[in-house]
């Protein structure tokens, strides 16, 4: 069975012993990856009923983080339990956002969620920046968003 982030987090929830480094893919560029798949979205449902559900990812990362200078967690664009786990485990956040109107509204919701996580779960969480993506400098909306 391929080791994925979903498998790792499920094992933490079940309090099973595991080699936290098994399944981590190492590359020549000195970048390691923990693969993921659609099972991660299924994990959302399991996290709802898990004990200490906001800290499952933090508990896993605490086993491996000393080996790395940085750990990047690329979340899906939702505010579900996996994203909340990532926010609870993170030191800081970089928010990618498209230079358009509707994604800006989503960012407002995300900022509100980050504030709640900071208040209740992870007091040290900071926002390191906002990364604009898909910027078309020819449009007025993109120009005003960049400003």
Model-derived segments and spans:
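P-loop NTP-binding core
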Residues: 1-147
């Amino acid at each position: 069975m391929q080791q994925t982030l979903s498998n790792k987090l499920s094992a933490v929830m079940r309090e099973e012993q595991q080699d936290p480094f098994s399944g981590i893919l190492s590359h020549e560029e000195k970048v390691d990856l923990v693969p993921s798949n659609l099972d991660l979205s299924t994990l959302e449902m399991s996290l709802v009923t898990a004990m200490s559900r906001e800290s499952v990812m933090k508990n896993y990362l605490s086993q491996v983080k000393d080996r790395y200078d940085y750990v990047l967690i690329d979340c899906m664009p939702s505010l579900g339990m996996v994203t909340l786990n990532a926010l609870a485990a993170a030191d800081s956040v970089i928010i990618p956002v498209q230079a358009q109107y509707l994604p800006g509204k989503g960012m407002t919701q995300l900022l509100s969620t980050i504030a709640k996580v900071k208040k209740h779960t992870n007091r040290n969480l900071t926002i390191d920046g906002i990364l604009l993506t898909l910027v078309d400098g020819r449009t007025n909306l993109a120009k005003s968003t960049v400003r």
